[in-house]
Amino acid sequence: MTHASSSLFDFSPFAGQSERYVDLIKQFAAAQPFRSAEVSELVLDDDYHRRPLRPEDFEFLKFAKPVRPHNVSRLPALASNRTLLSIYELGTARLPRNANEAEWNRFVQFYSDDAQVLGAQIAPFLEAYAFEFLSRDQTPSADAAGLARILEAESLFWDQTFARLMRNDYLEEGLRFIMVQRWSLAPSKQRALARAAASGLFDMLPVELRPALDNLPADAALHEKVAASCGVTRQQHAYWQFYLPTSMAKCNLLYALARRPDRAFGLVGAAFAAEAEALAFSLALERACAHLTSANRGAGGAADAQARQAELLERASHALQSIGTAYGASAQAMAAQGIGAAERLCERARWDLGEQLLWLSSIRHYVAFAHRISTRIDAECPDIDRETFIEPHEMCSTTHVHNDHRLVTIQEGEMLFWGNVGMQHKMNEGDMVLIPDGRLHGSTVVSGECTYHQPIIPDEWVQALVAELDAKAST
């Protein structure tokens, strides 16, 4: 039994067992719905039953040391969150798109007994692996102060992010990537809470005190309008390959808690945090995209925003007090722990998204950095560690991240490179680009064959160049 005073997630029971679970993960990922992507699948044709997992990565990922705050954007976090989201949504019905036999087969394969059984075995391990850090060394307060911090931090982040995208002339493309993270994943978060409510996990609270992610249709309408304005119009999960690991983690945290009745109080806290984060984003989006806001919306401006935030904080405060009164200090502490875990994840997600958008919006600078680094390699360390690849026409890499900084340098052939929906950065012989540690990207070969190198770049080299970029931005 897990007591309210313990961590929400604990990897220690799985210590020394990683090899066994990796074997199960390999079996799960070997199924047809999870095979690596083909070049035509960069954006899926509204195929809910297709989830490229890059099974080849599980040949070298060990899952021995759980995720920590500093590596939330790296490959183990990406792989574990893609796998978890696939497992959780084996319990969500999406019917075949048509009567075609191949479509029916995809539908049946996705929900197969093998997938269900393997998923049930894998999920507790991956949850502990991916989420232990969220409540580790945490002493949350037993009130709603964490929600106020989330509202403030998220509001500041979004205002600064939209301003930077405008400065870098990347607003439309940046919004496209943002809406993939927000609008495309919103149904998963709502479904997690609906599943929890149907299972009675919110029954400790009266309806008027419960957290909610679908309580204002006007927000959903604005999100859909903004998404459509930048070309994000397909159903969930058409943009699967462009989800950041931390974006999926926010969905998965809700799913993980929602399937465990003994974590019900933790779910209440995490759900209130998800509502606070969503509210801060909606208000910031309304400010940034006022031209897409309906004429009768937001008439109160700042006063209306403040009222909505105050209502959330008051409702959450009453909910925590109600839990403490009815179920005791341990239950209230677990609810606060849920807020604290989500607050920590929100901070890491802001960092992850901010770094991805900085890289994408400054890609021309990272091309220039690559040439400077290449010159330095030739002068100082020509034998630097590197990987070389020779790939055939239409060889496609499912989007992925690296655990180090790398150059991509084309020796011969042509490649298309991307890190965002709609991005096609053409690379020919002699072209190169710097890919920082943890930045999501993919590519495909468009010539008959392509030979390219990936030198691994010391962190201090990259940080010095990024500091130049930061200095220019601040002047």
Describe these PLM feature segments:
Residues 2-164:
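Phosphate/adenylate-binding glycine loop and adjacent helical scaffold
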Residues 5, 106-159, 176-180, 203-301:
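Active-site-proximal alpha-helical scaffolds that flank and shape metal-associated catalytic sites
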Residues 121, 128, 132-137, 351-399, ...:
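A short, N-terminal "cap"/entry segment at the start of jelly-roll beta-barrel domains
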Residues 273-337:
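An amphipathic alpha-helical core segment
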Residues 315-365:
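Acidic, carboxylate-rich catalytic segments that either coordinate divalent cations
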Residues 382-385, 389, 442-475:
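Double-stranded beta-helix
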Residues 401, 407-429, 439, 466-467:
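A short beta-strand-loop-beta hairpin characteristic of the jelly-roll/cupin
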Residues 417-418, 425, 435, 440-447, ...:
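Short beta-strand His + acidic residue motifs that chelate non-heme Fe in jelly-roll/DSBH
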